[in-house]
Amino acid sequence: MDKNELVQKAKLAEQAERYDDMASCMKSVTEQGAELSNEERNLLSVAYKNVVGARRSSWRVVSSIEQKTEGAEKKQQMAREYREKIETELRDICNDVLSLLEKFLIPNASQAESKVFYLKMKGDYYRYLAEVAAGDDKKGIVEQSQQAYQEAFEISKKEMQPTHPIRLGLALNFSVFYYEILNSPEKACSLAKTAFDEAIAELDTLSEESYKDSTLIMQLLRDNLTLWTSDTQGDEAEAGEGGEN
């Protein structure tokens, strides 16, 4: 199938909310080796975000059931086996995306904006792996995630306006990484607050087409800050995450 047909099919799949099909089309487009257009990049990102999102959400539900069935051995074993099945799916999806990023997307990114977008994506998918990792594996995965976010963060500060939705989305997800994965609420808050304040200070640089995206992410940054500063008791707080714009 040629590229245009695959992209067309991906859009159809998106409208039908068949995200596995959508991801499979956009994976094929990526494997053709050319740099993706902004539209193709967003289709790829939306597809995989939904595919992995469904598994992350299932994993949380089943993990919580597994913890609640302590003492009921049969039930707990069933929940554990089901969680492990979901984990395998989740890992396969993340490894698919990370392989596309390493082989095609990051090496082919010619603009700073694309580079930041893909490095952020690399940070995100290592973070999703870190959520389900345990033991020795986890440390290496967490480091990979942090490195990708950090590299993206440095490029974004040099090359992009503080109001750019990709720079804001990166700050949002990197701060979630500090809060949820590294358990560093102070660092998470300081990163989110700085990103929010810098964007507020330069609101006049907001372009017409990204106005909605940028202000939405700023709202999410502020929501997380409110949640995290009130959450000093260390309750499990579900942080909002960046839309892939």
From Swiss-Prot:
<dbReference type="GO" id="GO:0042149">
    <property type="term" value="P:cellular response to glucose starvation"/>
</dbReference>
<dbReference type="GO" id="GO:0070371">
    <property type="term" value="P:ERK1 and ERK2 cascade"/>
</dbReference>
<dbReference type="InterPro" id="IPR036815">
    <property type="entry name" value="14-3-3_dom_sf"/>
</dbReference>
<dbReference type="GO" id="GO:0051683">
    <property type="term" value="P:establishment of Golgi localization"/>
</dbReference>
<dbReference type="GO" id="GO:0090168">
    <property type="term" value="P:Golgi reassembly"/>
</dbReference>
<dbReference type="GO" id="GO:0003016">
    <property type="term" value="P:respiratory system process"/>
</dbReference>
<dbReference type="GO" id="GO:0098686">
    <property type="term" value="C:hippocampal mossy fiber to CA3 synapse"/>
</dbReference>
<dbReference type="GO" id="GO:0005829">
    <property type="term" value="C:cytosol"/>
</dbReference>
<dbReference type="GO" id="GO:0019903">
    <property type="term" value="F:protein phosphatase binding"/>
</dbReference>
<feature type="site" description="Interaction with phosphoserine on interacting protein">
    <location>
        <position position="56"/>
    </location>
</feature>
<dbReference type="GO" id="GO:0035148">
    <property type="term" value="P:tube formation"/>
</dbReference>
<dbReference type="GO" id="GO:0031625">
    <property type="term" value="F:ubiquitin protein ligase binding"/>
</dbReference>
<comment type="subunit">
    <text>Homodimer.</text>
</comment>
<protein>
    <recommendedName>
        <fullName>14-3-3 protein zeta</fullName>
    </recommendedName>
</protein>
<comment type="function">
    <text>Adapter protein implicated in the regulation of a large spectrum of both general and specialized signaling pathways. Binds to a large number of partners, usually by recognition of a phosphoserine or phosphothreonine motif. Binding generally results in the modulation of the activity of the binding partner.</text>
</comment>
<dbReference type="GO" id="GO:0000122">
    <property type="term" value="P:negative regulation of transcription by RNA polymerase II"/>
</dbReference>
<dbReference type="GO" id="GO:0001525">
    <property type="term" value="P:angiogenesis"/>
</dbReference>
<dbReference type="GO" id="GO:0050815">
    <property type="term" value="F:phosphoserine residue binding"/>
</dbReference>
<comment type="similarity">
    <text>Belongs to the 14-3-3 family.</text>
</comment>
<dbReference type="Pfam" id="PF00244">
    <property type="entry name" value="14-3-3"/>
</dbReference>
<keyword id="KW-0597">Phosphoprotein</keyword>
<dbReference type="GO" id="GO:0043067">
    <property type="term" value="P:regulation of programmed cell death"/>
</dbReference>
<dbReference type="GO" id="GO:0005634">
    <property type="term" value="C:nucleus"/>
</dbReference>
<dbReference type="GO" id="GO:0005615">
    <property type="term" value="C:extracellular space"/>
</dbReference>
<dbReference type="GO" id="GO:0008039">
    <property type="term" value="P:synaptic target recognition"/>
</dbReference>
<dbReference type="GO" id="GO:0019904">
    <property type="term" value="F:protein domain specific binding"/>
</dbReference>
<dbReference type="GO" id="GO:0005737">
    <property type="term" value="C:cytoplasm"/>
</dbReference>
<dbReference type="InterPro" id="IPR023409">
    <property type="entry name" value="14-3-3_CS"/>
</dbReference>
<dbReference type="GO" id="GO:0007165">
    <property type="term" value="P:signal transduction"/>
</dbReference>
<keyword id="KW-0963">Cytoplasm</keyword>
<dbReference type="GO" id="GO:0090128">
    <property type="term" value="P:regulation of synapse maturation"/>
</dbReference>
<dbReference type="InterPro" id="IPR000308">
    <property type="entry name" value="14-3-3"/>
</dbReference>
<dbReference type="GO" id="GO:0140297">
    <property type="term" value="F:DNA-binding transcription factor binding"/>
</dbReference>
<dbReference type="InterPro" id="IPR023410">
    <property type="entry name" value="14-3-3_domain"/>
</dbReference>
<dbReference type="GO" id="GO:0045824">
    <property type="term" value="P:negative regulation of innate immune response"/>
</dbReference>
<dbReference type="GO" id="GO:0042802">
    <property type="term" value="F:identical protein binding"/>
</dbReference>
<dbReference type="GO" id="GO:0140311">
    <property type="term" value="F:protein sequestering activity"/>
</dbReference>
<dbReference type="GO" id="GO:0098978">
    <property type="term" value="C:glutamatergic synapse"/>
</dbReference>
<feature type="site" description="Interaction with phosphoserine on interacting protein">
    <location>
        <position position="127"/>
    </location>
</feature>
<dbReference type="GO" id="GO:0008104">
    <property type="term" value="P:protein localization"/>
</dbReference>
<dbReference type="GO" id="GO:0030324">
    <property type="term" value="P:lung development"/>
</dbReference>
<dbReference type="GO" id="GO:0044325">
    <property type="term" value="F:transmembrane transporter binding"/>
</dbReference>
